[in-house]
Curated annotation (Swiss-Prot):
This is UDP-N-acetylglucosamine 1-carboxyvinyltransferase 1. Belongs to the EPSP synthase family. MurA subfamily. The keyword Cell division applies. It comes from Listeria innocua serovar 6a (strain ATCC BAA-680 / CLIP 11262). Cell wall formation. Adds enolpyruvyl to UDP-N-acetylglucosamine. It catalyses: phosphoenolpyruvate + UDP-N-acetyl-alpha-D-glucosamine = UDP-N-acetyl-3-O-(1-carboxyvinyl)-alpha-D-glucosamine + phosphate. Its EC number is 2.5.1.7. Keywords: Cell cycle, Cell division, Cell shape, Cell wall biogenesis/degradation, Cytoplasm, Peptidoglycan synthesis, Pyruvate, Transferase. One of its GO terms (molecular function) is UDP-N-acetylglucosamine 1-carboxyvinyltransferase activity. The gene is murA1.
Length: 430
């Protein structure tokens, strides 16, 4: 078993380049199934386990997929099958986004109920409601969602919650539907805009991505195209916090300020200096951090995917902070691990009361989900002694070479095979 070991106390300085966004690339890869002509070429693709998983799903569906360096090519011109099996979908709930493209392209889709990080229920009912509105017959049997439609017809769909996945799935299904589809109360994340741009480059007619209403005029066919994935705003935010908590000076290359404006506002409120430069965002950490309250919200509110990382900087600030989670239930599983590092945190309903500044101590902790994995490593950067983070399978779903990038900025961090180290002499690693 691998673990990441961090020796706290080093200031981070230098520059770090962001990779393509995990939350953008997965639906874009799924959308390549819609192209009945040509070969799709996707650039700036991050080297993540989730990308390999979605590629395997497409291969199973009879698409020809290759992934070399940061480029994925997909030829979906053959006879696409419509059954996405449990063995792949259980690894990653985002696999559900193949359902819309399959339904539009083949008239049917059979997809296993999804897995991934265990963050609350995250139901798929909003996805299915959209498919049904367009004329699909949907049923759930034996752990699979089955949808069939002789033809999809444009419809008006109102989402009870601005779900990112449902917005993406319904939008993709609507591209080949007959007539016009209007989706209201949609997600407005940058990843939605990136997907819409890709679909439009393929010949779709999607209007309004980034606003609360998306309108899709159905077309008869889509043609493969070339597309570069937007930079990962969550990776950028994670490194911004790493720079801030260590009192460092780091340029986050390719970070897009408009994509993380809520995070920038909160960090500036805490006393962190943020400078927008031509090729990214520079973050300069202060001597003291001011306490702030944060509430996660759908975009353009504070992103739930930055919640656990933000709690690290909150527990280092002077005074009492509150983190309130409104997007997902059960997303405080990492709190118990942070307490092992001497964090003063108390869960009250959907909020965590955080008293600071904490004097963090190194400990052996286990990642409970993708973003918690990164947050525990961040905490290790400022803890006294050695922090050992296990369950790296979560980290690898969303961060490529995270420890290597931190090393390049000056952190004492190593990724090691647990069976090959002497835990009584961790100093020998550095």
């Amino acid at each position: 078993m691998e673990k990441i070991i961090v020796r706290g106390g080093k200031q981070l300085n230098g520059s770090v380049k962001m990779e393509g966004a995990k939350n953008a690339v997965l639906p874009v890869i799924a959308a390549t199934l819609l192209a009945s002509k040509g070969t799709s070429v996707l650039k700036n693709v991050p080297n993540l386990s989730d990308v390999f998983t979605i590629n395997e799903v497409l291969k199973y569906l009879n698409a020809d997929v290759s992934f070399v360096n940061d480029e994925v090519t997909v030829d979906a011109t053959g006879e696409i099958t419509s059954d996405a099996p449990f063995e792949y979908v259980r690894k990653m709930r985002a696999s559900i986004v193949v359902m819309g493209p399959l339904l539009a392209r083949t008239g049917s889709a059979r997809v296993a109920l999804p897995g991934g990080c265990a963050i609350g229920s995250r139901p798929v009912d909003l996805h299915l409601k959209g498919f049904e509105a367009m004329g699909a017959i949907v049923k759930i049997e034996n752990g699979y969602i089955e949808a069939t439609a002789e033809k999809l017809v444009g419809a008006k769909v109102y989402l009870d919650f601005p779900s990112v996945g449902a917005t993406q799935n319904i939008m993709m299904a609507a591209t080949l539907a007959e007539g016009t589809t209007v989706i209201e109360n949609v997600a407005r994340e940058p990843e939605i805009v990136d997907l819409a741009n890709f679909l439009n480059q393929m010949g779709a007619r999607v209007i309004g991505a980034g606003t609360e209403v998306i309108r899709i005029e159905g077309v008869k066919e889509l043609t493969a195209t070339e597309h570069s994935i937007i930079p990962d705003r969550i990776e950028a935010g994670t490194f911004m916090i790493a720079a801030a908590i260590t009192g460092g000076n780091v340029l986050i290359e390719d970070a897009v300020p408009e994509h993380i404006s809520s995070l920038i506002a909160k960090l500036e409120e805490m006393g962190v200096q943020i400078i927008e430069e031509e090729n990214g965002i520079r973050v300069i950490g202060p001597d003291k951090l001011k306490a702030v309250d944060v509430k996660t919200m759908p975009h353009p509110g504070f992103p739930t995917d930055m919640q656990s990382q933000m709690m690290v900087i909150q527990m280092l600030s002077e005074g009492t902070s509150i983190m309130t989670e409104t997007v997902f239930e059960n997303r405080f599983m990492h709190v118990e691990e942070m307490r092992r590092m001497n964090a003063d945190m108390k869960i009250e309903g959907h909020s965590v009361i955080i008293s600071g500044p904490a004097k963090l101590q190194g400990a052996e902790v286990a990642a409970t989900d993708l973003r918690a994995a990164a947050a525990l490593i961040l905490a290790g950067l400022v803890a006294d002694g050695y922090t050992q983070v296990t369950e790296l399978k979560y980290l690898d779903r969303g961060y490529n070479n995270f420890h290597g990038k931190l090393q390049a900025l000056g952190a004492d961090v190593e990724r090691v095979d647990d069976s090959k180290i002497d835990v009584t002499n961790l100093a020998s690693l550095f």
